[in-house]
Amino acid sequence: MKKLMAQKPNLQIQNGMTVIDKGKKRTLDECFQMFQIIYQVTTRTEDILLITKDVIKEFADDGVKYLELRSTPREENSTGMTKRMYVETVLEGIKQCQEEGLDIDVRLLIAINRRDGPAVAKQTVKLAEEFLLSSDGVVVGLDLSGDPTVTKKAGLKLALHLCEIPNQEEETKILLGLPPDRIGHGTFLNSTAAGSEEIVSLVQQNHIPVEFCMTSNIKSQTVPSCDKHHFGYWYSLGHPAVLCTDDKGVFATDLSQEYELVAKTFNLTRSQMWDLSYESINYIFASNAVKSKLREQWCKLKPALFD
């Protein structure tokens, strides 16, 4: 972000560098300011390429071996960037990181913002279908959808953000009927958090993995404190769980921090944390061949961690 800000001094974004420099000390309002800063400084394909590569490198430096990036295609009339160009540029960034020898396997979920409406959602699904066929397995799914059934029919994996706010029971039941391949956040799914036992049963019956983003939930104030986080509920049930960062740069976190937070909050042992990481391979959207390769990597790394 600092690189892009330096390249565009004419933008004069109020308090931009101050917000960026605050890092982990950002307030909720400052996290939302970060979203606005990102949109203002990423208007060209070269901006998208830079930020894609930087994010991948940061994850690689953190020891992450498999990454599913999520990004919403954007068009920018002022620069001529189209949604197709946007996706192509993200894919180019992934390709360049691979060519540079980074020890990380990166895939892409093309995201849809529900607020954009069904027409835009359909366009994005169509774009995702095309890249599913042409990206040599890099595009593996869709994050959210105006009409999620279209996604499933196209062979794309589907991650749905569900129950991020309370009192969404009817909508949640409908969407769980698809069912999605993973649930994002799911903050209010369970009955102890304004959800319902029926919804919990649906999630369990379909063995739908839940993605947990503790730092994001705390900073966005959907969860009051770490010890109240819904990870504890689902983990106690032995339900499939995946620890994630949500928007890494915005919420100033990394995957190591998310694992550390969960371990400290719920008093999990090193062995339990290992199992959590290893089992998450089962829930990625890449092929079985990729899963097998990752399991081999994990098994090679394990002895050094438990000596």
Question: PLM features: what roles do these ranges have?
Answer:
Residues 1-156, 164-182, 186-307:
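Metal-cofactor-binding active-site regions of metalloenzymes
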